[in-house]
A protein has these predicted regions:
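Conserved alpha/beta-hydrolase
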Residues: 40-43, 51-75
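Short beta-strand/loop motif that positions the catalytic acidic residue
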Residues: 223, 229-231
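Alpha/beta-hydrolase-fold enzymes
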Residues: 103-202
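Active-site nucleophile elbow and catalytic-triad environment of alpha/beta-hydrolase enzymes
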Residues: 196-219, 225
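Short beta-strand element of the alpha/beta-hydrolase
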Residues: 29-37
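Catalytic histidine neighborhood in serine/cysteine hydrolases
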Residues: 249-266
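N-terminal cap/lid segment of alpha/beta-hydrolase-fold proteins
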Residues: 1-25, 268-270
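Catalytic nucleophile-loop/oxyanion-hole region of alpha/beta-hydrolase
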Residues: 67-103
Length: 271
């Protein structure tokens, strides 16, 4: 399949960093912001397929690339993580003047961002945000981290760790005094990586603290816009705690779909 044609725009952040956002723009006053998963980008097949579908149906699209995910190292020590909603907020503010309706769609880590952003009192939500969809989301990061340690997920974890480790070597060259790269030798799981690197460079105490504060599950009761979460029952990345049934039953705005099949982000065809 031919790749979707995006027009790239660079947004400068308040902390002197940048975000590369890939747009498909048409005359529509409706835009969908797409948020990718761990170690993904606007090149990810599920982002490409979704962008293509939305564009064919008359929506403009803004596909985020988180810090250090657009093929270029970011300027600051901080990178992206499951709770980094301030960068999503920056993208929303960037598109706000040009559109009447904004929709947020997030996959996996990106879905956690979308849910957390909508339920976090840190942000006053624009009335232009109309609805949200989150797909294959580890709403309980600790539970998901335990699921990822299961033997059937070894290959997935290894693939993530391989690219994350490469990034840390580059970060070490950029900030030699801020990163103890020797800790990489101790990293055997994603939890280890979050303990030694993700948490430390992003202002958390350790993986436990990061998972506690960044998990979106605690923010779901505060969601005020129509929001759909689709988590497949056969998703190997999700623990039982990643299916917020009670929260959905008690909310007027949050809806949960739990199809039997779909795996992890397996609903999206290749387009």
């Amino acid at each position: 399949t031919k790749p979707v044609f995006f027009k790239r725009k660079r947004i400068e952040t308040l902390d002197d960093d940048f975000l590369d956002i890939d747009f498909i723009e048409n005359s529509s006053k409706k835009i969908v912001i797409l948020c990718h998963g761990l170690e993904g980008s606007s090149d990810s097949k599920y982002i490409q397929a979704t962008a293509k579908l939305l564009s064919l149906n008359g929506y403009s699209v803004a596909a985020m690339n988180y810090r250090f995910c657009s093929g270029e190292i970011n300027r600051q020590l901080v990178t992206y993580h499951s709770g980094k909603t301030d960068d999503l907020h920056a993208v929303i503010n960037y598109v706000l003047p040009n559109y009447e309706s904004i929709y947020l769609v997030g996959f996996s880590l990106g879905g956690n961002l979308v849910l957390k952003y909508n339920g976090d009192s840190l942000f006053s939500l624009s009335s232009k945000i109309k609805a949200n969809v989150a797909i294959s989301v580890p709403v309980d990061l600790k539970g998901s981290s335990i699921a990822l340690r299961r033997s059937e997920n070894t290959l997935y974890s290894w693939r993530f760790l391989r690219t994350l480790s490469k990034k840390m070597h580059l970060k070490h060259h950029q900030f030699p005094k801020n990163l103890d790269i020797r800790q990489l030798k101790k990293v055997k799981t994603l939890t280890d990586f979050d303990d030694y690197f993700t948490s430390k460079i992003n202002g958390f105490e350790d993986a436990e603290d990061y998972y506690l504060k960044a998990s979106s599950k605690q923010f779901i009761p505060n969601i005020s816009k129509p929001t759909l979460l689709i988590n497949a029952l056969d998703d190997p990345f999700l623990s039982e705690s990643c299916f917020p049934v009670r929260e959905a039953n008690e909310s007027l705005n949050f809806y949960l779909m739990t199809p039997l099949h779909g795996g992890h982000v397996g609903f999206i065809s290749k387009g």
